[in-house]
């Protein structure tokens, strides 16, 4: 086992890695927005463009860890999740991906594109009636993206796009909290709450808002421009605790 | 009249939660059952056990390729399981005015978290949703063959090179103050 490093030394290591002027540092971009906002389409276009520009890109999606996703999936199937369990299981899935996917890629200098980030948990859980402060605690130590693109749509547009091809499922429609049997009606009510929470988070956490009612190409070229500007941002010191905790874990695992 | 000896009998009230925490599952379950046995039969609701939701059973199925969970991930899952127990077992029993024992409850998780080096403040916030028990008991058992802490150490040791016995020893030290602070 490698020698144990104290917290101060781990902080120095983290800063040296992410502020090294000679190399391309890891960069984290989050795509956020209500269902039907078109963010997944934009995320794919953005990834293709980044790769063409020579970036090494890793994508991570919401609720996708090999460890926790099957647990969530089986419980969603039988509609067995209460708001707290829903929130805690998604936070566990997120934490596992931070430790096994996101941090290793950032450490290696890659661009990580997150199709939904912790803000999805915050918006949905608060829309389910949970306390924002408690939900935020679940995601500690916080890892802040370098850029958060928030795809803003109205509840009507979101509902129209989602229901055009399918019926929203039980949790997507928020039927666990709306007590409405009609999935479309429930979806509209729930997504209205989710969007309201997103709008608050956008102000608090300084998201870059993209008008998702624009054409696909307009949005894509806007993202390129925003990345060219934002890509030069210095590393956020706020992230040092998250990096240090991961480094400590990694050294234990080595 | 002879003075009554200090009793260990459970004081029965409407809806009473008793927490029993410790390292060894068999011992805390036995202690919880002993406590409940002192309660009139019609008021007993039973013992709420760790992993009633089956989250940790399912975790084992995921296998090693999924990556070893950290202590933080395991505690988020413990909290999810506890939320399930509260929703389906503990709160309904309390609402019916019964006596229910939770074995283990919050103190076991706090002790493991502290032993694994997690901040006390985060742990306290994480379990903020769990009601305080009317009585908090701690079982100072000698073995650590089964239960959450044993399981968690086993999961961590898959990849982390953790020495399970060190975590168990540290958890034991943390357990008593944690249990007391929840009273």
What residues fall within each predicted segment?
Chain B
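NTP-dependent small-molecule kinase module
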Residues: 1-12, 18, 27-39, 142-183
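A generic local structural motif
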Residues: 4-7, 87-88, 122-126
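Short loop/turn elements that form and flank the Walker-type P-loop nucleotide-binding site
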Residues: 13-14, 95-97, 131-133, 151
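P-loop (Walker A) phosphate-binding loop of NTP-binding proteins
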Residues: 22-23
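Hydrophobic helix-cap positions at the C-terminus of alpha-helices
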Residues: 39, 63, 85, 89-93, ...
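ATP-dependent small-molecule kinase phosphotransfer cores
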Residues: 43-122
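Conserved phosphate-donor/acceptor-positioning beta-strand/loop module used by diverse small-molecule
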Residues: 102-105, 123-124, 129-146
